From Swiss-Prot:
Entry GO CC: apoplast; extracellular region
GO BP term, pick one: nitrate import
A Gene Ontology molecular function term of the record: hormone activity
Swiss-Prot/TrEMBL keywords: Apoplast, Developmental protein, Glycoprotein, Hormone, Hydroxylation, Secreted, Signal
Positions annotated as propeptide: 28-61
Subunit structure: Interacts with CEP receptors (e.g. CEPR1 and CEPR2).
Keyword Iron-sulfur: no
Region (Disordered): 49-76
Protein name: Precursor of CEP7
Classification via InterPro entries: CEP (IPR033250)
Induction note: Triggered by nitrogen depletion.
Entry similarity comment: Belongs to the C-terminally encoded plant signaling peptide (CEP) family.
Organism in which the protein naturally occurs: Arabidopsis thaliana (Mouse-ear cress)
């Protein structure tokens, strides 16, 4: 009787784990047609655009502390 109960308990735990894993895997289906339309529109766009990358000087000397009272605060 104890062996049957232990087997039932292990089986129940396995079933619960599998059910939980199936809930994690569920998700909404992706619509790939919208993505392909966007890529076609982007490819058909103006090909004469030039890409200009700018580099900004981010050194320790560029740091300016904020005066008291002008800080945006936490979360802003």
């Amino acid at each position: 009787m104890a062996k049957c109960t232990l087997t039932s308990l292990i089986l129940l735990l396995i079933v619960l784990v599998l059910i939980q894993e199936s809930h994690i895997v569920e998700g909404r289906p992706l619509k790939s047609s919208r993505i392909s339309n966007v890529s076609k529109k982007f490819a058909a766009g103006n090909s004469n655009l030039s890409s200009k990358l700018t580099t900004e000087d981010h050194s320790l000397d560029a740091f300016r502390p904020t005066n008291p009272g002008n800080s945006p605060g936490i979360g802003h």
